[in-house]
Amino acid sequence: MVKVEVLGMILAGGQGSRLYPLTAKRAKPAVPFGAKYRIIDFVLNNFVNSGIYAIYVLTQYKAQSLTEHIQRYWRFGAFLEDHFILLVPAQMYRYEELGPVWYRGTADAIYQNLHLVHNHAPKAVAVFGGDHIFKMNIRHMVEYHYDTRADITIAAYPVPVAEATRFGVLQVDEEWRITEFQEKPEEPKPIPGRPDMALASMGNYIFRTEALFELLEADARDETSAHDFGKGVIPRAIRVGYRVYAYDFHRNPIPGQEGPNLYWRDVGTLDAYYEASMDLVKVDPVFGLCSPVWPLRTANLFSPPAKFVHETGERVGRALNSLLAGGVIVSGGTVRESVLFRRVRVNSYSLVERSVLFDDVEVGRYCRIRNAIIDKNVKIPPHTEIGYDLELDRARGFTVTPEGVVVVPKGYRF
């Protein structure tokens, strides 16, 4: 195989249990987001926009829709050997060594595919998660990795201490070399001088290739290991003296974007997913989807334009502060602060507000829907209310989150 300078490895095998029922029939990175995208699209765009074109996507859990999406819509030409996005399903590649096991953790997923790294002989390996919403110039992080002569570089993001229990938490010295790593601690240590904030690992790493091999081979021999980067590999690397540095995500320059890079969302819970979706409908969103110099590619499905019809009395088709995909029809209803995916139809006298409606949802007449996520292929009968009586919503079998967001599963029948 052809040699490359930087090899991308995207971890896309997560089960995403905290996103259930959105992950009942799809992998977490395949969950739709932003009216036309899937979550995996954002990290793929980051690699491609950064000029890193040699990418493997490691899959495992309910990967069919993710596989189809990438195979159909993320294809380079056939004539450039160093330009590829290839899916790598869990396949017990080290069966003779490990026995009949799937990926046992994030580190093991890479370990079981080290032969792919070896084939390309890269100078650095970029190991990124496939389930975050952000823009990142990965090339800038790679250059920082080279400049610091790091063995491992970890992208870092300041978060409130109260939220840091969901992340790996970093302690750094004045040169941003990491001195301690805590994986999802119960009592996160704050950033020195900022007692209300902690420095969170974004789960995105750049490895010197030789260091990656050394660390993963040692981890595979450790029968007590969880075979996870955050739980074992990174803390051990710091402990035994590898050069492990934090990279300040806020200093990451995005072409066409002024000021610090502030937006990164781990959409690993239903409430986090919902809030990230609501971020998009703000008048001036921090995370914008429209940039000619940092394009966000996804499937081109050739949907017809969105359509708004009727303007008689209260029967007015309109959408305010919302994102609408192709094929949406708002027929005499009102949509406010919402995200509507392809071919959604909102019929007359209905109100949809602060909600996310996936492909092919139809809202009957005189419905009221608020603070909801409705998965694909749901037909809502006339006069239905969702998000107004949470006990009734629970009785219907809907999920109600701690923040009161109602989630209707795919294909639900009333």
Curated annotation (Swiss-Prot):
Keyword Transferase: yes
Annotated binding of alpha-D-glucose 1-phosphate, by residue: Y103, G168, E183, K184, S201
InterPro entries attached to this UniProt entry: ADP-Glc_PPase, ADP_Glu_pyroP_CS, GlgC_bac, GlmU/GlgC-like_hexapep, NTP_transferase_dom, Nucleotide-diphossugar_trans, Trimer_LpxA-like_sf
Pathway noted in the entry: Glycan biosynthesis; glycogen biosynthesis
EC number per UniProt: 2.7.7.27
Keyword check for Nucleotide-binding: yes
Domain of life: Bacteria
GO molecular function: ATP binding; glucose-1-phosphate adenylyltransferase activity
Gene3D superfamilies, A to Z: Hexapeptide repeat proteins, Spore Coat Polysaccharide Biosynthesis Protein SpsA, Chain A
Catalytic reaction(s) noted: alpha-D-glucose 1-phosphate + ATP + H(+) = ADP-alpha-D-glucose + diphosphate
GO BP, one annotated term: glycogen biosynthetic process
Keyword terms of this UniProt record: ATP-binding, Carbohydrate metabolism, Glycogen biosynthesis, Glycogen metabolism, Nucleotide-binding, Nucleotidyltransferase, Transferase
CDD domains noted in UniProt: ADP_Glucose_PP (cd02508), LbH_G1P_AT_C (cd04651)
Known partners and oligomeric status: Homotetramer.
HAMAP family per UniProt: GlgC (MF_00624)
Function: Involved in the biosynthesis of ADP-glucose, a building block required for the elongation reactions to produce glycogen. Catalyzes the reaction between ATP and alpha-D-glucose 1-phosphate (G1P) to produce pyrophosphate and ADP-Glc.
Family, as annotated: Belongs to the bacterial/plant glucose-1-phosphate adenylyltransferase family.
Record protein name field: Glucose-1-phosphate adenylyltransferase
Source organism of this protein record: Thermus caldophilus
